[in-house]
Amino acid sequence: MSTQYETQGYTINNAGRRLVVDPITRIEGHMRCEVNINDQNVITNAVSCGTMFRGLEIILQGRDPRDAWAFVERICGVCTGVHALASVYAIEDAIGIKVPDNANIIRNIMLATLWCHDHLVHFYQLAGMDWIDVLDALKADPRKTSELAQSLSSWPKSSPGYFFDVQNRLKKFVEGGQLGIFRNGYWGHPQYKLPPEANLMGFAHYLEALDFQREIVKIHAVFGGKNPHPNWIVGGMPCAINIDESGAVGAVNMERLNLVQSIITRTADFINNVMIPDALAIGQFNKPWSEIGTGLSDKCVLSYGAFPDIANDFGEKSLLMPGGAVINGDFNNVLPVDLVDPQQVQEFVDHAWYRYPNDQVGRHPFDGITDPWYNPGDVKGSDTNIQQLNEQERYSWIKAPRWRGNAMEVGPLARTLIAYHKGDAATVESVDRMMSALNLPLSGIQSTLGRILCRAHEAQWAAGKLQYFFDKLMTNLKNGNLATASTEKWEPTTWPTECRGVGFTEAPRGALGHWAAIRDGKIDLYQCVVPTTWNASPRDPKGQIGAYEAALMGTQMAIPDQPLEILRTLHSFDPCLACSTHVLGDDGSELIAVQVR
């Protein structure tokens, strides 16, 4: 039975052909997407489904709050560290712990490192192949590719011989008949607009980024012991520092600090001379995508803010990445965000596979309930092999968070819009320069292409902040300030009998909040509302659709059986649905085939 209704400026109509893409690949975790298209192949209904259950909130109940970071960090191995950071923030807020300046600086270095790493991996390894036609690169003239690359930047790997070697490697790979990770690409699709030389350049940089991303994360290994899942501690950072030539075996020394400086320099060089020019090249040949995939970005966006410049101060003046919320498209009125206010952040479950005492009412995370209830309702297929979801009922393992009752978009585009409209000078200069280079209006950033450009902007911004915070750290160390942790309130005997706190930051993918309540030294309640919970949310009791669903609305597909347009827009958000489980069919086989119906 078809249904039609109006919400958030869109007309939802589930009549017409139904296309199912399951799973969405080149993301973190497991995701399914279903859309309806009309006779003109325009998407008139979109359904986003998270196909796995996390449950760490349940696991944490009754545990030592000082250990929470180590559990929640395992939510994700890609955006590694951000959940641990939000967790230690939350526990410190609850107990009243103040961290040393160096701990705050090192935490910011860890976060900025992740931003650079994650945005590079997303741009090249996860989203890049939506824009770069790998097979078309075989048609390129390496000499012309060299001329193109040298016209864009001074990156040294740009000779004709270099691109000839890369092309030859690709040719041998293709002639071997095993395309591997490139096997399921829609090569030759009419939406691929880059010329062969730009495709060869992009593919070469894809390989370089794949290699270089291993170097960036060594900063995590220096200060956190390893990557993924570096070590943290409630009260600071677990890394002693010794800048003398002897003593303090195992501490971070000048050799390690010099390595960090070297990596920061090389990271900025790669982003400035490879990633930024590549992003602009993609934009130059794909300008129509500045009007596709707008979704909620011109209506409702949210950022908590991040990178406190002053230790233990999360106020507006301290956060180098501004926070705020915009609703109803009023960008002249960026609203303050209060994560303790029960009327602001609320999660709904009436279309998710969870239960509340009253499913029609949202709950603030401090009153949050994680009660899984897998009940797909009236679907085509079986409970373990769903052929078509029923969006009128429950259809996702993701709750529906709302800010003051509004579905919101979070992530680089949301952050950039909020920082821009709050007058952040660096953001205004960077965005204006990008859009001017592409001869596009500012509104063009509110799009699928805009999300790609905003990640490039943020990578460059984060690389600059890496140097800023490293310089601050070195100044402290040279002045004899070596403290990296406070143990004043380490023992539970120093804690209140009951307390609660909230920790927030901005993960590469968007606004991240952890809420914790402690009773008698143990975790009594723990709730996480993560970026993809916001963006991939299902419908709520008012029928509002989430950011993914909204961004797909109105998209015209050139070849419905090759849903490149769907992948471009979904990948522009960099979905992260956590990677700890697999989805199995009735016979135990893993469901890995992409199906379009």
Residue spans of the language-model regions?
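Metal/cofactor-centered catalytic core regions of large enzymes
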Residues: 2-597
